[in-house]
Curated annotation (Swiss-Prot):
Family note: Belongs to the peptidase S10 family.
Signal peptide interval: 1-17
The keyword Nucleotide-binding appears for this protein: no
InterPro entries membership: AB_hydrolase_fold, Peptidase_S10, Ser_caboxypep_ser_AS
Organism: Trichophyton rubrum (Athlete's foot fungus)
Recorded name of the encoding gene: cpyA
The protein's name: Carboxypeptidase Y homolog A
Biological processes, Gene Ontology terms: proteolysis
Acetylation as UniProt keyword: no
EC number of the protein: 3.4.16.5
Main location: other
Lineage: Eukaryota, Fungi, Dikarya, Ascomycota, Pezizomycotina
Free-text function comment from the UniProt entry: Vacuolar carboxypeptidase involved in degradation of small peptides. Digests preferentially peptides containing an aliphatic or hydrophobic residue in P1' position, as well as methionine, leucine or phenylalanine in P1 position of ester substrate.
């Protein structure tokens, strides 16, 4: 779903460490201590001596305030694996890996690249009324099982493109994106399924993937705690899926997502593009309200919260000045993280910056995903409709129809969010992969302009600052009006757009963090035009 601030900001507030321990005890997450908590002390002592004073002091604070918190791990989800006989198809990665062909140079090579022998794909037809499949990608060596749900295009599935959708968090299920934003249906307060006329599968087939493991209906006996580790799983999923359904493999493929997918997508796209012989016809990448380059994006939080992003100020002048005063240290920590990419410096950067720069907004009670509204229900990430979606997905008949193997569904897993944070993933410079991606495919960065947490000012700033061969021309290109051209509202302004070479940025008017939720017509409009090749 979205950039998962709840657990992060609670963790970031060092002054409220004791309260945080109480909150974590009450959140229902199963946790178990490491065999020997003294390991943390010993490891910390070894590394502290080599760290600069500010960072060393931070880890001393962490040791005091989070002594019992840091060494905790999430327990695996309870699950029951269904026998292969209950699935309509089982695709073996080992079978794909064993196929060799003769190349144009006369040399033998594998038909499809990549380490696939440890993966299987299980497939189940869900509903004959709407062609859809669900199932699991299994990494048998690592005991990882990723849940996916595929919906065929409503229009022309034999020719329409295929889109992969990824929610962020990290730790939020893509099924919230399915039912809250852009899927073929939503769930009302009476748990009734309601059709969505603006679904992204209007002119494309769409795959929703719960990743990393232990998110949504996915599960594992282990965990994934950084973005890079998840990339190979996504490559395997797509390879095995298109092998089972070659009719979709010939179509254009696009990878899309929002929020922390600003981390995921550069890595996943680079992983796919690194393989020469593949059945994935990757044509573009789309990131909505993403976090991609923290060093460039964090300076834009104060302007967005203080009335310079097109909406009234949420914070008072004193708080805005305090954020300005904290920014220099925040950026210094991020720069150190960018230089080393070590958790020992990237974690302090995330903890300090989120406490000093993000927490003041969070403490107002306003919705961090939409500066225009109060947060109605923090437990449901400010969107009470999530409660109905979660309740519907937890119904036994629904889980049975989908082939689900876990006992329950939750929209976001705070343990995953914490794991990524404490492995230093949050502040890492994944934007550095974007230039190599731009060499091969177009990239669209779009942003609802009412979002605070991954705001349009920050996304515009990092796209204009990115160093790539087309940097100067893109940075100098002015924003132009983005208008509807595809329906009866032709001529209606829905935002602004700038594009040069393979790079495009869009500001979408009147949308928060989740553009398809707030502006469904505009969302489908720009998606359809992007998939047709406009702006690239």
């Amino acid at each position: 779903m979205k950039f998962f601030t709840t657990g992060l900001l609670a963790t970031a507030a060092l002054a409220a460490a004791q309260e945080q321990q109480v909150l974590q005890a009450e959140d229902g997450m199963g946790r178990a201590p490491l065999p020997d908590s003294s390991i943390f002390d010993e490891t910390l002592q070894k590394f502290q001596s080599s760290l600069e004073d500010g960072i060393s002091h931070f880890w001393s604070e962490m040791k005091t305030n989070f002594k019992d918190y840091l060494p905790l791990i999430s327990l695996p989800k309870k699950h029951t694996r269904r026998p292969d006989s209950e699935w309509d198809h089982v695709v073996r990665g080992a079978d794909i890996e064993s196929v060799w062909v003769q190349g144009a140079d006369g040399e033998k090579r594998r038909e499809i690249d990549g380490k696939l022998h440890n993966y299987d794909l299980r497939v189940k037809a869900v509903d004959p009324g709407v062609k859809q499949y669900s199932g699991y990608l299994d990494d048998n060596d690592a005991d990882k099982h990723l849940f996916y749900w595929f919906f065929e295009s409503r229009n022309d599935p034999k020719n329409d493109p295929v889109v992969l959708w990824l929610n962020g968090g990290p730790g939020c299920s893509s099924l919230t994106g399915l039912f809250l934003e852009l899927g073929p249906a939503t769930i009302d307060k009476n748990l009734k399924v309601v059709s969505n006329p603006y679904s992204w599968n209007s002119n494309a087939s769409v795959i929703f993937l719960d990743q990393p493991v232990n998110v949504g209906f996915s599960y594992s006996g282990s965990s994934v705690s950084d973005t890079v580790a998840a990339g190979k799983d996504v490559y395997a999923l797509l390879t095995l899926f298109f092998k089972q359904f070659p009719e979709y493999a010939t179509q254009d493929f696009h990878i899309s997502g929002e929020s922390y997918a600003g981390h995921y997508i550069p890595v996943f796209a680079a992983e796919i593009l690194s393989h020469k012989n593949t059945n994935i016809n990757l044509k573009s990448a789309l990131i909505g309200n993403g976090l991609t380059d923290p060093l460039t994006q964090y300076p834009q939080y104060r302007p967005m919260a203080c009335g310079e992003g097109g909406y009234p100020a949420v914070l008072d002048q004193g708080t805005c000045r305090s954020m300005d005063n904290s920014l220099e240290r925040c950026l210094s920590l991020i720069e150190t993280c960018y230089s080393s990419e070590s958790a020992w410096v990237c974690v302090p950067a995330a903890m300090y910056c989120n406490s000093a720069i993000l927490a003041p907004y969070q403490q107002t009670g306003m919705n961090p995903y939409d500066v225009r509204t109060k947060c109605e229900d923090m437990a449901s990430l400010c969107y009470p409709q999530l409660n109905a979606i979660t309740e519907w997905l937890n119904q036994k008949p629904v889980m049975q129809a989908l082939g689900v193997e876990v006992e329950s569904y939750e929209s976001c897993n705070s343990g995953i969010n914490r794991d990524f944070l404490f492995h230093g993933d949050w502040m890492k410079p994944y934007h550095r992969l974007v230039p190599s991606v731009l060499e091969k495919i177009p990239v669209l960065i779009y942003a609802g302009d009412a979002d605070f947490i991954c705001n349009w000012l920050g996304n515009k700033a990092w796209t204009e600052a990115l160093e790539w061969p087309g940097h100067k021309k893109f940075a100098e290109t002015k924003l132009e009006d983005l208008k509807i051209v595809d329906n009866k509202n032709k001529g209606k302004k829905i935002g602004q757009v700038k594009s040069s070479g393979n790079f495009t940025f869009m500001r979408i008017f009147g949308a928060g963090h989740m553009v398809p939720l707030n502006q469904p017509e505009a969302s489908l409009e720009f998606l359809n035009r992007w998939l047709r090749g406009e702006w690239h």
